[in-house]
A protein has these predicted regions:
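Soluble FAD-dependent oxygen oxidases
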Residues: 1-297
Length: 297
């Protein structure tokens, strides 16, 4: 099944599962690959949610895997990589009461991706540990060169942040107020806009904001996991790292996703552990770049 179908079925019962933002991602590949989620800050990675599964091994065996039987397969199928150990036929995962969701969108526009722009990007990232303390997650994007016409470009930062406890839009704005105030004072004249929207359930948010990216594009991808210490240590070094990571991407971009936090760090998978990359447990950010084919030269 795909995530949209599972979200809909769970929502009808007042429940939610840990899943992603795309309509048509299959639950099997998502879990086997680890599966980060905006709900991870509360409940952990998708792989941490598996309770049991049925698989077909390369030799044709049909096995039930869980913490008590075929535990080696059970470990490997939770984050060990898709199509590596066999085919996932069905899976049982944890569910949770669906939370109301407050969404804050934040956008910064600049005429060019100069030093000020990258300092602003680094500053926002340096505040991720503060936001994570409120169990906030988010999908930000950085576009150093964003075409607005055939001949003109701007630099763009756009982000969607979620709070999953029913906090009002006004309260969410209050959490971000010191961040926005600092940007406005430190870099006067910054074009910054933000707004909040409240949703009664996670699925209601998903229906309105799911990923609509087209399939079939050519991209070169790269990523790093960043810990809170990296984000809050040397600001100059962080700024240079963000600039180096994103500054030569042409009309491509980067995504400093805020998807770690307490839920990922403190997750207790069935059997005590799983195959999720251990660095996820101490990271807040999945920083990825997506270089559109042919965008640099």
């Amino acid at each position: 099944m795909i995530l949209n179908e599972i979200y809909a079925a769970a929502d009808a019962l007042g429940l939610v599962i840990v899943g992603g933002q795309a309509l048509d991602v299959g639950i099997g590949g998502y879990i086997i690959a680890g599966g980060h989620s905006q709900l991870g800050v509360l409940y952990g990675m998708a792989a941490d949610q598996m309770l049991e599964a049925t698989i077909v091994t390369p030799s044709g065996q049909i096995l039930t895997i869980n913490a008590c039987q075929n535990s080696d397969y059970f470990y490997a199928f939770r984050g060990g990589g898709g199509s590596t150990f066999g085919v996932l036929v069905d899976v049982t995962v944890k569910t949770y009461p669906t939370p109301p969701v407050t969404m804050l969108t934040l956008e910064i526009l600049a005429s060019t991706a100069d030093d000020t722009f990258f300092e602003q990007m680094a500053y926002i990232m340096s505040q991720y540990p503060y936001l994570s303390n409120y169990s906030i997650s988010g999908y930000p994007y950085i576009y150093p060169i964003y075409p607005t016409s055939a001949t003109t470009t701007i630099a763009v930062y756009e982000a969607v942040f979620l709070l999953h406890d029913g906090t009002s839009g006004a309260a969410m704005t209050g959490i971000f107020e010191p961040i926005i105030k600092y940007i406005s004072i430190t870099w006067p004249g910054t074009y910054l806009v933000n707004s909040t929207t409240e949703y009664p359930t996670f699925y209601a948010h998903f229906q309105a904001n799911h990923d609509t990216s087209a399939a079939g594009t050519d991209q070169v991808l790269g990523s790093r996991l960043l810990s809170p210490e990296v984000l809050t240590g040397n600001f100059t070094a962080l700024t240079e790292a963000v600039k180096g990571f994103t500054g030569n991407l042409g009309t491509s971009g980067a995504a400093p996703f805020l998807l770690g936090g307490k839920g990922v760090k403190d997750a207790v998978p069935q059997g005590g552990s799983d195959a999720v990359l251990p660095a996820w447990r101490t990271s807040l950010v999945h920083m990825s770049e997506f270089d559109n084919h042919g965008s640099r030269r």
